[in-house]
Regions:
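N-terminal lobe/hinge region of extracytoplasmic solute-binding protein
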Residues: 38-93
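Short, hydrophobic/aromatic-enriched beta-strand segments in well-ordered soluble domains
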Residues: 34-39, 101-105, 172-182, 276-281, ...
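Short amphipathic beta-strand and strand-loop transition segments with alternating hydrophobic
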Residues: 82-92, 162-167, 266, 584, ...
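Surface-exposed binding/hinge segments that line
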Residues: 140-241
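Alpha-helix-centered segments that form part of catalytic cores
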Residues: 234-269
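Long beta-strand-rich cores associated with HINT superfamily self-processing modules
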Residues: 587-612
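Secretory targeting and sorting signals
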Residues: 1-29
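Extracytoplasmic/periplasmic ligand-capture domains
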Residues: 2-3, 74, 101-135, 255-258, ...
Length: 612
């Protein structure tokens, strides 16, 4: 089961708990049709499309269980999946832009039900603010959570879609109309969802049904969708938003949850330990399985050194995570693996709260409000984060060339980056740490004249738990911030991602991992209604600038637009990028086909090629 949605960022989370290496079953003892993949993070849900479950590991599992019109390869290129279907522009007007998506005939879900374009309509339900409101499912921009707790609302799709998608007479083609040409239009189309299973689950069914019954259930979904039957749609929304938020799977788990069209289906899961997937025998929606793998096991180990030892013991086939320097040193000593390095697109950053997130109680902390005192104190706080020291001590031992980030929109090396950082206001946060501390102290004392290391101002920080690198990062930040006059009080939470939105916290730090490369990819972090705007940012001038990124433009215009946006972001002290995550993947020498991607899918984007 995979629910696709508009291109977004996923969060790189910390594992819920470390797994003792002694509990791992040796990979080498398994048949060579099994691949055991390490991940730092423990799975929290089988639906990564919700704000609180938008984590990289959840998305990785989903990647194996569903596939649509395209995938993104290790070069960050969009590759069309013509086995599933085709899509093309059918009207290219400046105020009437239409794309038709056609599903190939003969494709089936893992329960044997034929796939058609009705299965694409869930994407609209999950992404259109207008549909949610008109169907009585709630306002995604309001304080109350809508019936579908989707992270896909807001942004390019919702802002530009016109009316409802149009279904062809044979129900194999869906045509979308946008009010203008949009940038990266090929990434904002619909993906398939097994809507019949959502209906059956909402109706209380406990097992797989006949194809005839499944098609009748899909017809009921289509009828409810067309008529905007609020009661039926809300019952489906409850299933979509809650039923997949499980971490334990066994023989008693309802098999309707695992219907998908990917190469693998979920077989079992052990909370904070592992997820096992088996080959989908009815898979015919994508590239043929050319390898020898019929079982995929994700093992969750937060300690990089322990994971390296597990790899050495043959208990893992693929190591991929957030390594410490010690873990990398251990990996380099292994003779039975190939080590693949590089730079990941995931970026570490510190964020500050401005106001309450939707549905949360008022925020009355130190950073409250745009402009004035709130902005001064946010900037002072971000100046006190010792980015250079963090980079030198935690990242450069792994990647000696690791840069400090001057933008959270594009990375160093991107065409125009130097022009961007020279003009976007990031220079305010650059200099020796002593100079930055002095600047921070001046801003702090402007509002708290008595603030000092012996009389510090408290800042409550959400700290991702069970991650040694994050613990070390917070310790460095806490020590330096105290020199300025801030007392960073860390609340360490293993399951931290749902807590980002809480008004309890003045600041958080974690990583965003893009699932695709789009012009408007960072908009959701800062715009009103954006799926990742959980710090109460509400700046109409910034929203207007970010909206321009939805339109096709040349590189120079793109950079100029980001400059305008980041000048506001840095002047308000909303975020500060620290480093790009170093990419370290270690692979069993006998395993072929592992080609790590810098995007959030990492090693799992090409599962059909894996084999021994």
């Amino acid at each position: 089961m995979k629910f696709t949605r508009s291109a977004k960022f996923a969060l790189a989370a910390a594992a819920s708990a470390a797994l003792a290496v002694s509990l791992l079953a040796p990979a080498q003892a398994a048949t060579r049709s099994t691949i055991v993949i390490h991940d730092t993070n423990a799975l929290t849900s089988f639906n990564s499309g919700q704000p609180d479950t938008n984590l990289t590991i959840n998305g990785k599992v989903g990647n194996l269980t569903g596939i649509g019109f395209y995938y993104i390869n290790d070069k960050k290129n969009v590759v069309r999946n013509t086995t599933f279907g085709d899509f093309k522009i059918v009207k290219n007007g400046s105020t009437d832009f239409r794309i038709a998506y056609t599903v190939n005939k003969g494709l089936v879900w893992s329960d044997g039900t034929p796939i058609n374009a009705v299965d694409l309509l869930m994407s609209h339900v999950l992404s259109s603010n207008a549909y949610s409101k008109s169907a009585g499912l709630g306002d995604p921009d309001g304080d109350d959570t809508p019936a579908f707790d989707s992270n896909g609302y807001g942004g390019t799709y919702s802002d530009n879609i016109v009316g409802q998608p149009v279904l062809s007479a044979d129900k194999m083609t869906l045509t979308l109309q946008f009010k203008q040409r949009i940038a990266n239009w090929d990434l904002y189309g619909p993906g398939p969802s097994p809507v019949h299973t959502l209906v059956l689950l909402a109706e209380g069914k406990k097992g797989l049904q006949s194809v005839k019954d499944n098609e009748a259930a899909r017809d009921r979904f289509f009828a409810a969708y067309n008529s905007k039957n609020t009661a039926v749609l809300k019952s489906i929304g409850k299933v979509w938003s809650e039923a997949y938020d499980i971490t334990e799977v066994n023989n008693s788990t309802n098999p309707l949850l695992w219907v998908g069209n990917g190469g693998f289906t979920v077989d079992s899961a052990v909370t904070k330990s592992s997820v096992t997937l088996k080959t989908n025998p009815k898979y015919n929606s994508g590239p043929k399985l050319t390898g020898t793998i019929d079982t995929v096991i994700f093992k969750f180990i937060s300690d990089g050194t322990a994971a390296a030892q597990a790899l050495a013991n043959g208990e893992l086939d693929v190591y991929s995570g957030q390594p410490t320097a010690d873990a990398v040193a251990a990996l380099k000593k292994l003779s039975n693996v190939n080590l693949i390095g590089g730079i990941n697109a995931c970026y570490e950053h510190w964020d500050t709260r401005v106001n309450a997130a939707p549905g949360q109680p008022d925020y009355n902390g130190i950073f409250k409000g745009h402009g004035g005192k709130g902005a001064d104190l946010r900037k002072a706080f971000l100046l006190s984060i010792p980015r250079e020291e963090i980079n030198e001590k935690l990242i450069k031992p792994i990647n000696p060339n690791a840069p400090i980030l001057g933008s959270t929109f594009i990375a160093p090396g991107f065409d125009g980056y130097e022009r961007l950082v020279a003009n976007n206001g990031s220079g305010f946060y650059v200099g020796s740490q002593d100079a930055l501390n002095a600047k921070a102290a001046r801003l702090l004392k402007k509002h708290y004249p008595s603030a000092s290391p012996s009389n510090p101002v408290k800042v409550t920080v959400l700290v991702p738990g069970n991650n040694p690198r994050r613990a070390a990062q917070f310790a460095l930040a806490k020590a330096n911030a105290l020199k300025v006059g801030f007392d960073l009080v860390g609340d360490v939470q293993a399951s931290w991602s749902p807590k980002i939105q809480l008004s309890t916290y003045d600041a958080q730090f974690f990583a965003y991992c893009p699932s695709a490369v789009t012009q408007a990819g960072s908009n959701a972090n800062f715009q009103v209604g954006g799926g990742n705007n959980r710090n109460g940012i509400n700046l109409p001038a910034l929203d207007a600038i970010l909206n321009k990124l939805q339109l096709p433009m040349d590189n120079r215009t793109f950079i100029s637009t980001i400059i305008q946006a980041e000048r506001i972001i840095f002047a308000e002290g909303l975020t500060s990028g620290v480093f790009l995550h170093p990419a370290v993947t270690a692979v069993n020498k006998n395993l072929k086909g592992i080609k790590p991607s810098p995007l959030s899918d990492d090693v799992v984007w090409n599962w059909w090629e894996w084999g021994y």
